[in-house]
A protein has these predicted regions:
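Short histidine-centered loop motifs in beta-beta connectors
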Residues: 16-20, 53-56
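Short, well-structured beta-strand-loop connectors
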Residues: 20-31, 58-68
Length: 74
């Protein structure tokens, strides 16, 4: 099994985490909701698999390139 890292594209605040470790996600499923410059930005999975790590908490300020979620996929 391979791991896919979901990383932040910009500086933002983590508004909502919509998945938990162990959740099975499909490509296109929402993982997180971020806020940047008063805009809400959904973070969608690019792969199908199982969430194995959530590296952020709600309310955290993240930087571009920060690890958000790790997904194990076939």
């Amino acid at each position: 099994m391979a791991h896919f890292d979901v990383r932040a594209e910009m500086v933002a605040n983590v508004l909502t985490i919509t998945v938990r470790v162990g959740d099975v996600v499909a490509s296109g499923d929402q993982l997180l909701l971020l806020e940047s410059m008063k805009m809400e930005i959904p973070v969608l999975s690019e792969v199908s698999g199982t969430v194995v790590e959530i590296a952020v908490v709600e309310g955290e300020v993240i930087q571009g390139g920060d690890l958000l979620v790790k997904i194990e996929h076939p």
